[in-house]
Amino acid sequence: IRSPKDSFDLGIGMIHQHFKLIDVMTAAENIILGLKGNAVLDMKKVHKDIQELVDRYGFDLDPAQKVYTMSVSQKQTVEIVKMLYRGANILILDEPTAVLTPQEVDNLFEVLRNMRDDGRAIIIITHKLNEVLELSDRVAILRKGKYIGTLQTSEATVESLTEMMVGEKVSLDINRPMPHDLKKRLTINNITCTNEDGLHVLENVSFEAFGGEVLGVAGISG
């Protein structure tokens, strides 16, 4: 396999962690972009075929919706449907839950199970062991780029997978002492920011930071 075309010809589709979509185009336009066909496209048929895939597997997607108005999970759905539309029977997803909320993860897993039950092969690349145990039937372990082994998920635990990944037993218990200085150092109330396009990148964010602690801020990349 030397190119994405070779993968498509073999029925393999890759969904990358960072999406490759054109924001000003619709879902349907992104899905068919680059495909060979007639000089005049029958968009009515394209929408019909996409909607059949959406209904078949339980996706949340409107083929006519512009990408720039979509949530992150909907953009991911466009990428998945794009691969299905092009005939992929083997789907490889790179860190698919890294940009999703817990509810969106549940929805994604339901769709992936539907595709599995329909006979498609699903490969997920992830570091999240709890999700591996929840979704997969088998799990293959890599360490420093080398294949270590494969287990039936029913026989695996977080501890056993961690040991295979690291190469030694690892304690998963972390004891953190309470900070001595609980003096409030910073207060942020309802901060809102826009980017150069005028779209909100922060909206009504509030938090407090205290001395002697590390405050983690979690969010989607970008």
Explain the meaning of each model-derived region.
Residues I1-G222:
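Glycine-rich phosphate-binding loops of nucleotide-dependent enzymes
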